[in-house]
Regions:
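Short-chain dehydrogenase/reductase
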Residues: 3-88, 103
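Active-site loop of short-chain dehydrogenase/reductase
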Residues: 8, 63-64, 91-92, 137-151, ...
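Conserved Rossmann-fold SDR core element
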Residues: 27, 91-93, 173-176, 183-195, ...
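Substrate-binding pocket helix/loop in short-chain dehydrogenase/reductase
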Residues: 106-107, 111-116
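A short, exposed helix-loop element centered on a Lys and neighboring polar residues
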Residues: 130-131, 177
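Catalytic loop of short-chain dehydrogenase/reductase
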Residues: 138-139, 143-185, 196-199, 205
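C-terminal helical subdomain
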Residues: 192-193, 209-275
């Protein structure tokens, strides 16, 4: 099997910036079609990038892009994005569940509207976008669903920390495991991907902190590309860590993803324990 995304159609939630945009641009360099469903129609006062600027970058990178302004929580918006992808490019080969919300407050301090937001975007959005694309994935040659969610680390120090966020992210990973089983007979792969270290994104800079000890989003893009170009029938039901994927691909020098001149210890991401 030739490992390329040339001519493949990727339907992604979010993607205006950060990891999602990096994944989109890696696909675009192969000549993929990238359809982005995102709310960012106009610039954010503090964050760079909109769904329109992201599509412009996709096209400059060599792909074809389509922006769909909408909310992954809204069933009509999701249907619109699916239909737009099929109308523009003839089908859907890949779904990337990238959109996410984060609030690391304790259970006592977490406002229920923030809890609901995380559940609706993270867990429900993953289920909804995947569900809506299934009929079209069945018709694809090497169909994949890739969800940006963590391994199910049941250590109490993770389950009991920022519980509201943990529930929403683990729900995404359970969706991966369930879809992989449900769709195995159709040859549709479902996998999750999570970074070992913090990634230098707006969420890390603004919520988590520690961007100076973080890898670039490109490591997630390269790992996602590796997963999405594998045989869907043989690569499914995995909760991958980014650098493990790359090591399996024969990549041994991961320093290119670290900050220039950085020689210290990188900060581990949430849900990842020291080796």
């Amino acid at each position: 099997m030739t490992r390329t995304l040339a001519g493949k159609t990727v339907l992604m939630s979010g993607g205006s910036r950060g990891i999602g945009l990096a994944i989109a641009l890696r696909a675009a360099r192969d000549g993929a079609n990238v359809v982005m469903l995102a709310k960012t129609a106009v610039p954010h006062p503090k964050l760079e990038g909109t769904v329109h600027t992201a599509v412009d970058e996709v096209e400059r990178a060599g792909g074809k892009g389509l922006a769909v302004v909408g909310d992954v929580r809204n069933e009509d918006d999701v249907r619109t994005a699916v239909n737009a992808a099929v109308t523009a490019f003839g089908g859907i080969d890949i779904v990337v569940n990238n959109a996410g919300a984060i609030d690391l407050s304790s259970s006592e301090q977490l406002e229920m509207k923030r809890y609901d937001l995380m559940q609706d975007i993270n867990t429900r959005g993953t289920f909804l976008l995947s569900k809506a694309a299934i009929p079209h994935l069945r018709a694809a040659g090497n169909p994949h669903i890739l969800t940006l969610s963590p391994p199910l680390n049941m250590a109490p120090h993770w389950v009991g920390r920022h519980l509201g966020y943990t529930l929403s992210k683990y729900g995404m990973s359970l969706c991966t495991i369930g879809l992989a089983e449900e769709l195995a007979a159709d040859g549709i792969a479902a996998n999750s991907l999570w970074p070992r270290t913090l990634i230098d994104t707006a969420a890390v800079r603004n919520v988590v902190g520690g961007a100076g000890r973080a890898r670039s989003p490109q490591i997630m893009a390269d790992a996602a590309y590796a997963v999405l170009t594998r045989d869907a029938k043989r690569c499914t039901a995995n909760l991958f860590i980014d650098d493990e994927v790359l090591l399996d691909e024969g990549v041994t020098d991961l320093s290119v993803y670290s900050p220039a001149g950085f020689a210290g210890d990188l900060a581990l991401d949430i849900f990842v324990d020291p080796a």
